[in-house]
Every structure is written in structure tokens, then in C-alpha cells.
Amino acid sequence: FNSAIGPYKGGLRFHPTVNQSILKFLGFEQVFKNSLTGLPIGGGKGGSNFDPKGKSDREVMAFCQSFMTELCKYIGADTDVPAGDIGVGGREIGYLFGQYKRVRDLYEGVLTGKGLTYGGSLIRTEATGYGVVYILNELMKDHNDSLDGKTVVVTGSGNVAIYAVQKATQLGAKVVAMCDSNGYIHDPNGINLDVVKDIKEVKRGRIKEYADRVEGATYTEGVGIW
């Protein structure tokens, strides 16, 4: 969208709602987000209305490879550096980066969010979720307060939400609810993050499974968490 102060930088989104209008606004928004970091990076956004949900690993890999075969003509370490977003996690980034190397025969900083074994950054997975909570905690300090002892609700159950829950818990809060696009769970005893990770990261399931596995937890279908 804008590269006035550096190469384009922003996430790739794979979700059925993706269209040109959404990506244009997200790219516009990314310009300001990146500018506020003080780093020499511009803003951009990309993606597809491909939905990884319900697809096999082979199907996701095939799409990522086809997508990168075209995208690789327009990106590079000093031109445009995509990252992950909704629907594009470590698995998808790995497939995309593998195809980039295969087509361009280059091993450079062309995608962020890669695994540690092929050039990724330590704690990249946790960074966004942790950042949300650190900023919230700093805001509360301005009001002579902190997260310690607070009851917290977190929207989502993907990568950002999982690590926001983890950091909030480490800072003394009790997270009692999370959600996905189908509904939300409530656990008055505090969310068991190991169970959530197993459901979302290992089995790639839906958050409603949490209520079947944790005593005292409930699931509400078709209602927003707020």
C-alpha cells in the first residue's frame, strides 16, 4: 500500500471474507501501525478467499505453493516482506517459504513468522499476544492498577489469543472465557491453556470441544463473547 519509508510489510490472510476492499483498508491501517514502531518499513496486506479450515495438509500445501508461484514475482527482502495473519500460521508460512526458495533459489528474509530451523525469530509466535497484554498492563499502570487479580475475557482462540491468555495468566489475571467464530467457552476456574492448545494447535478443532473435556466449563453456540 505504501513504501515511503521502507519495504512493504504486512500479513497474508486466507479467509472466505477476503476481498479487495478489505485488503485495501487493512493495508492502509498497516502503514500507520508500522510507522509507529519507528522502524523503516512501509505497510501492505495480501491474501485470498481460500479457507484452510476443513482442508487437508496436502490441499493447504498445494494452494500455498500455487499462491507463492505468483506472489514471488512481486516480493523480496527489500521490496515486500509478507507475514502471517488470519488463516496463515506457521504451517502456511513454511509452505510459502519452501516454494519461494524452490522458485527463486533464494534463502533470504522474505517472510516473517518462519520456524526457527529455517531462519525464524525466537518468540515470534508469542510476540503479538504478549504485546497486547504488555500494552494493557502499561495502560493500567497509568491508573495505578495492574492485571494482578483481575478477571479477563479474551476474544478469539488462535495464535494471538492463546499467548495473550498465557501472558495475562503469568501476570496474575484469571482468564475465564475465549471464543471462535461459532461461539464461546466459559470456565469459572480459569482457562486451561494446555487443553486449548491441544484443541487448536494439535487437532485443529473448534473451541466447543473444551467444554467436553474440562469439568465446570460451558459452551454457548452462536453468540458473541461480548
Q: Which residues does each PLM region occupy?
A:
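Generic N-terminal targeting/processing segments that precede catalytic cores or assembly contacts
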Residues: 1-25, 29-32, 40, 49-50, ...
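Glycine-rich beta-alpha junction loops
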Residues: 1-3, 43-48, 87-88, 158, ...
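Residue-level signal for pocket-adjacent positions within structured domains
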Residues: 3, 7-9, 31-36, 43, ...
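A general structural signal for short secondary-structure junctions and capping/turn motifs
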Residues: 4, 40, 72-73, 166-168
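Glycine/serine-rich phosphate-binding loop and adjoining beta1-alpha1 elements at the start
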Residues: 15, 32-148
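Exposed alpha-helical structural elements
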Residues: 22, 59, 91-95, 195, ...
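Residues that form generic nucleotide/phosphate-binding pockets
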Residues: 26, 70, 95-99, 198-202, ...
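Glycine-rich phosphate/diphosphate-binding loop of Rossmann-like nucleotide-binding domains
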Residues: 112-115, 120-225
